[in-house]
Amino acid sequence: MLRSLSTISKSTVRCMSLTSKMAAEQPSKQEVDDLFAEKPQHHNPEQRRHAYSVNKVELVGGVALDPLYKTGRNGKPYLIFNIITNSYFKQQDGTTLDQTERHAVSVFGKQAEILSKTIKKGSRLMVQGRLHYSGGQKDEQGNRTQRNTYIIAQTVQPLARAARENPDQH
């Protein structure tokens, strides 16, 4: 037992020694410049292997206004609507703060066509999708255009229908 502990100790020391040597290495000036430089003209995107990443959004909320159903230039349908979410925060003085946020959602294809007939203002939905940004580019004067954030929906699940305007109707 004692012998195995000393063996583990030697291997641990060897590993720590190698790690400290690697940590002490300094990158060259050229490596630092390459790291922060804009992409070179000869950059081949196929050479780069991307690390694992996730762009996923899940929202549960209510539809703010009746959705807008349109057909794109490519002839395919899309649906645009806003979903409202609420968050509640307790402040230091004990009062509760209600934060309401509006999220722009876009749905494409057959799902847009189906949802245009089933959801309306007040419908409760669960939306799963990804974030998408547009705008933010510089114009000729060097001013940046407004950057907009959208959610491109992959799944939209109705949770509850909007309340009827006249509850006496069946």
UniProtKB/Swiss-Prot annotation:
UniProt keyword annotations, A-Z: DNA replication, DNA-binding, Mitochondrion, Mitochondrion nucleoid, Transit peptide
GO MF annotations, alphabetized: enzyme activator activity; single-stranded DNA binding
Protein name as catalogued: Single-stranded DNA-binding protein, mitochondrial
UniProt record, GO biological process: DNA replication; mitochondrial genome maintenance; positive regulation of mitochondrial DNA replication
Gene Ontology CC entries for this record: mitochondrial nucleoid
Main localisation: mitochondrion
Transit peptide feature range: 1-30
InterPro entries: NA-bd_OB-fold, Primosome_PriB/ssb, ssDNA-bd
Protein role: Has a role in germline cell development and proliferation which affects the frequency of apoptosis. Required for mitochondrial DNA replication and transcription and fertility.
Disruption phenotype: Reduced mitochondrial replication, transcriptional hypoxia response, sterility, arrest of germline cell proliferation, reduced frequency of apoptosis in the germline. Severe mitochondrial DNA depletion in somatic cells but does not result in major anomalies in worms development. Hypersensitive to ethidium bromide.
Domain SSB: 54-160
Annotated organism of origin: Caenorhabditis elegans
Protein location: Mitochondrion; Mitochondrion matrix, Mitochondrion nucleoid
Gene name, Swiss-Prot/TrEMBL: mtss-1
CDD domains the UniProt entry points to: SSB_OBF
Tissue expression notes: Expressed in eggs.
DNA-binding recorded as keyword: yes
Protein origin, superkingdom: Eukaryota
Pfam family, one: SSB
